[in-house]
């Protein structure tokens, strides 16, 4: 799509050189054929370093745009990006008249399974009844897909993975832009989900696709039932994520992190290797590895327990007055 066509679609003024835009991408990863955006002061430091062909940016930051990057000036780059994401969204279901599928002869596929176009299914894979396998999905050798699992387009699943009943892999993330009237506009997610080898995903768990790039669950990680993992998360090797945990978008867990039941992160943060978050712990900042944390606001678990004891003693003393 031509940059002039994008400007017209967004009702923006553009009189520069017309160029072809192939896709949308993040500020630092966009290349010379892609369009990106910058919204707010937090990311302005990255504008001079973008390699994008074009950028949606507010007037006040136009001077930071590199000379080889075309600027589309907008009052709300995030909202303009949301509108544009729909224009670049991939089709949910292939319109190909004949599907191309590479399914190993040893794979076992039970009744009422939908398999999309350009799907690769490895040796000794088992796909149980009612599963949905979208376009461009790959499933590694000896993986087991339980009943009614949904695997959306472009998902990559490694070897010997277990996906338990009713889990959903690769659905759109929870991302919206807002106008001045408080109305919400969907951001279409064009990334994917990657599950590396030996990953287990529990029943009724959901893992959202990335806006760009991939949501990644690394090798050996085990995810319990009823867990939510948001878009663009990066979960390290051999993590344990217990039921009803919520991991917000762009959270990064190191290797062998344990998230206790009903714990959560607030997103865009890092938890170091070999950390443990106790049940119901609320993580709202980066955490050093190798320690046990708990409570909210998050702190060392031993300090949280001491605090609870002090509160209980103080309450008891006051009740006796």
UniProtKB/Swiss-Prot annotation:
Any one GO molecular-function label of the UniProt entry: N-acyltransferase activity
Gene Ontology cellular component annotations, sorted alphabetically: membrane
UniProt EC number: 2.3.1.191
Catalytic residues (positions): 231
Keywords: Acyltransferase, Lipid A biosynthesis, Lipid biosynthesis, Lipid metabolism, Repeat, Transferase
Highest rank taxon of the organism: Bacteria
Reaction(s) catalysed by this chain's protein: a UDP-3-O-[(3R)-3-hydroxyacyl]-alpha-D-glucosamine + a (3R)-hydroxyacyl-[ACP] = a UDP-2-N,3-O-bis[(3R)-3-hydroxyacyl]-alpha-D-glucosamine + holo-[ACP] + H(+)
InterPro entries (alphabetical): Hexapep, Hexapep_transf_CS, LpxD, Trimer_LpxA-like_sf, UDP_GlcNAc_AcTrfase_non-rep
Protein's GO biological process: lipid A biosynthetic process
Biological pathway: Bacterial outer membrane biogenesis; LPS lipid A biosynthesis
Entry-linked PANTHER family: UDP-3-O-ACYLGLUCOSAMINE N-ACYLTRANSFERASE, UDP-3-O-ACYLGLUCOSAMINE N-ACYLTRANSFERASE 1, MITOCHONDRIAL-RELATED
Assembly with partners or alone: Homotrimer.
Family recorded in the similarity comment: Belongs to the transferase hexapeptide repeat family. LpxD subfamily.
NCBIfam families per UniProt: lipid_A_lpxD, PRK00892.1
HAMAP family linked: LpxD
Protein's UniProt name: UDP-3-O-acylglucosamine N-acyltransferase
Organism: Campylobacter jejuni subsp. jejuni serotype O:2 (strain ATCC 700819 / NCTC 11168)
């Amino acid at each position: 799509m031509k940059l002039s066509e994008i400007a017209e679609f967004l009702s923006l003024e553009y009189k520069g050189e017309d160029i072809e835009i192939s896709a949308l991408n993040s500020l630092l990863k966009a290349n010379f054929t892609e369009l990106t955006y910058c919204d707010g002061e937090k990311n302005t430091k990255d504008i001079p370093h973008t390699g994008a062909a074009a950028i949606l940016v507010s007037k006040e930051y136009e001077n930071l745009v590199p000379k080889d990057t075309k600027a589309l000036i907008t009052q709300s780059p995030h909202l303009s990006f949301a509108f544009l994401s729909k224009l670049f969204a991939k089709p949910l279901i292939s319109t190909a008249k004949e599907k191309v599928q590479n399914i190993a002869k040893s794979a076992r596929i039970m009744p009422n399974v939908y398999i999309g176009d350009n799907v690769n299914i490895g040796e000794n894979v088992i796909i149980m009844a009612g599963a949905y396998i979208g376009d461009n999905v790959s499933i590694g050798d000896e993986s087991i897909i339980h009943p009614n699992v949904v695997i959306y387009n472009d998902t990559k699943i490694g070897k010997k993975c277990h996906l338990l009943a009713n889990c959903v892999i690769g659905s759109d993330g929870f991302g919206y832009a807002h106008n001045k009237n408080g109305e919400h506009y969907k951001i279409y997610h064009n990334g994917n989900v990657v599950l590396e080898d030996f990953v287990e995903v529990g029943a009724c768990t959901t893992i959202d696709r990335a806006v760009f790039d991939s949501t990644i669950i690394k090798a050996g990680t085990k995810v319990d039932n009823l867990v939510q993992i948001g878009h663009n998360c990066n979960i390290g090797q051999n993590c344990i994520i217990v039921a009803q945990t919520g991991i917000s978008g762009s959270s990064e867990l190191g290797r062998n992190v344990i998230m206790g039941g009903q714990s959560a992160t607030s997103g865009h943060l890092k938890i170091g290797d070999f950390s443990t978050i106790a049940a119901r712990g609320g993580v709202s900042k980066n955490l050093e590895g190798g320690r046990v944390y708990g409570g909210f606001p998050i702190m060392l678990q031993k300090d949280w327990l001491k605090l609870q004891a002090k509160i209980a003693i103080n309450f008891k003393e006051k009740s006796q007055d």
